[in-house]
Amino acid sequence: GDEVMGIYDRLHQILPGHPEKLFLLAGVNDISHDLTADSIVSMIRMTVERIQRESPDTKLYLQSLLPFDESFRRYKKLTGKTDMVPEINAQLEVLAKDHKITFINLFPLFTERGTNVLRKELTSDGLHLNEEGYKIWVKALKKKM
């Protein structure tokens, strides 16, 4: 995984090629660095605006953050931060609307019903998807293409 500014800093390797489509999903690793939801969304906004400025014909898809499951206790820096994900996602949806880009809300596909927690059968470590999780993700993306 990467952080939002890591992606931003590598855009110079991608944007000169003017990709037809670009799928952006970033932010969960930034949560582990004690950043606020607002600061994470602000960095994603900078990234979106740079993509639109430097490659205006690229169709940009902004994906929601995926949930995680703290009960695995593998990623200590995410402890107590489960509820930040829907807060960030709500702001990302507004960001997408304001910038006239497609927002793909993946979050509800991956959560335990009635919670903000990643379904246990879709992960082996509480953060990263397993094969079953990737199948759900691919299916969701194909619906939007």
Residue spans for each PLM region:
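A short beta-strand-loop structural module common to alpha/beta enzyme folds
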Residues: G1-E3
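Alpha-helical cap/lid subdomain in secreted, periplasmic
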Residues: Y8-M145
